[in-house]
């Protein structure tokens, strides 16, 4: 590992990791509500919220799959040093996957869990440019009273791919991040078109 590649992570590793973990939990418990991570650090190539999620969630027991756009020496060196996470080239071995919006068109190969242990599925950490610039979609499910309108900017093909692979309780949980913000989409949430 090249020490020149290493950049600072959390200022207060324990408290900041706890804040990041709680934000991720709250995002998945209240799908579609934007969570804010004001003290998230910066790493070139990763939005502050994306980097904070990695620092809070990844460790030696969580193999990470990197989409090609995130598979850089800088990102690898910092995640290996600060998180201790192993990297995998095989989607099926990943506990977490780091993707961009263009990587959402094919979710094949990621572990969707099984009926007995659905919690053993892969969690997708998806970096976007904006969490509020997409067309309005209605989210329903646990943690949402009636329905919630969400404007996450992802390709339409992602929603079709997600729906095609739906087999609750199996599925993929998703944390979308942009800037200092994140939104959770658990496998239990249903997404439909907004009706005029």
Task: Outline where the language-model segments fall.
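Internal, well-folded beta-alpha domain core
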Residues: 73-196
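N-terminal, charge-rich interaction modules
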Residues: 1-63, 67-70, 81-83, 179-181, ...
């Amino acid at each position: 590992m090249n020490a020149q590649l290493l950049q600072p992570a959390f200022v207060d590793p324990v408290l900041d990791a706890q804040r990041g973990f709680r934000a991720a939990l709250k995002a998945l418990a209240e799908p579609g509500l934007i969570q804010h991570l004001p003290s998230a650090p910066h790493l070139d190539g990763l939005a502050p919220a994306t980097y904070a999620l990695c620092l809070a969630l990844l460790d030696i027991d969580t193999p990470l799959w990197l989409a090609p756009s995130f598979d850089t020496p800088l990102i690898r060196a910092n995640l290996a040093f600060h998180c201790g996470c192993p990297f995998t080239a095989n989607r099926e071995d990943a506990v977490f996957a780091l993707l961009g919006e263009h990587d959402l068109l094919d979710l094949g190969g990621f572990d969707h869990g099984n009926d007995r242990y659905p919690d053993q599925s892969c969690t997708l950490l998806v970096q976007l440019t904006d969490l509020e610039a997409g067309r309005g979609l209605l989210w329903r499910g646990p943690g949402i009273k009636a329905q919630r309108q969400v404007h996450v900017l992802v390709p339409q093909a992602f929603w079709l791919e997600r729906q095609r692979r739906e087999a609750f309780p199996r599925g993929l949980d998703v944390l979308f991040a942009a800037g200092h913000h994140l939104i959770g989409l658990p496998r239990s949430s249903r997404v439909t078109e907004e009706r005029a």
